[in-house]
């Protein structure tokens, strides 16, 4: 179900950052596969859009949905109230098409894959709505479902040195990731310094990821800045 899918996404997001939790996740969970079959045959998403290929894209409406269904249990409703929805402009920043472009089914499918790869989005659907007046024009309704992005991390090192971290992969609904880590000794609870990391996954719409981090721990002081782009990104 969609609820189970979001649960797996949330657990995977929390465990993917460190080797041991990541290994445990892979041992204990098998992520459900998105059902792409119809009558026993694989459904090509782009083929469903072929009737609209070449038509002019008109209005693009973004409908953002919370992590859990509004009718969920009490804990899920509380989580929805705590969670800040991804902003409209953040979703639009990741779109590979604009109003006035010709609809390309393959491009829309690739765009859905791109947006699903974001830590803060668990799913996306694109609905094509034929224009009531102009048969050469279609409007798009893009529906996104947020992921739960707040997580706690920890690390145990030699000589009683410990790290505790808190991160949000969608700080204030911006799509940016902020992580704060503090270090202390388990022996006498002496302070060992703080580290802060900030990541922007799509800097100014360029699809480059900007990263900056700094601070100190028991071992050293650091200041890092980086700019990278994944090979498969636009």
Regions found by a protein language model. Name each.
Residues 1-234:
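Immediate N-terminus of the mature polypeptide
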């Amino acid at each position: 179900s969609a609820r189970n899918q979001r649960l797996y996404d949330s657990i995977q997001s929390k465990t993917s950052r460190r080797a041991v939790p990541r290994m445990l996740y892979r041992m204990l969970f098998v992520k459900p596969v998105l059902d792409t079959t119809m009558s026993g045959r694989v459904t090509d998403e782009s083929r469903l859009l072929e009737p609209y290929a070449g038509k002019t894209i008109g209005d693009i409406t973004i409908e953002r949905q919370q992590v859990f269904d509004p009718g969920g249990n009490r804990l899920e409703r509380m989580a929805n109230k705590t969670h800040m929805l991804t902003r409209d402009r953040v979703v639009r920043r990741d779109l590979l098409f604009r109003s006035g472009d010709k609809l390309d089914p393959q491009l829309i499918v690739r765009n859905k894959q791109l947006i699903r790869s974001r830590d803060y989005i668990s799913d996306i659907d694109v609905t094509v709505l034929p224009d009531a007046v102009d048969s050469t024009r279609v409007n798009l309704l893009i529906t996104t479902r947020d992921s739960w992005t707040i997580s706690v991390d920890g690390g145990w090192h030699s000589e009683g040195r410990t790290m505790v971290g808190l991160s949000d992969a969608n700080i204030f609904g911006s799509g940016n990731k902020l992580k704060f880590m503090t270090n202390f000794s388990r022996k006498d609870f002496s302070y060992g310094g703080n580290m802060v990391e900030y990541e922007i996954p799509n800097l100014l719409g360029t699809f480059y990821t900007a990263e900056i981090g700094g601070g100190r721990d028991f071992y050293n002081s650091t200041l890092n800045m980086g700019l990278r782009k994944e090979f498969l990104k636009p």
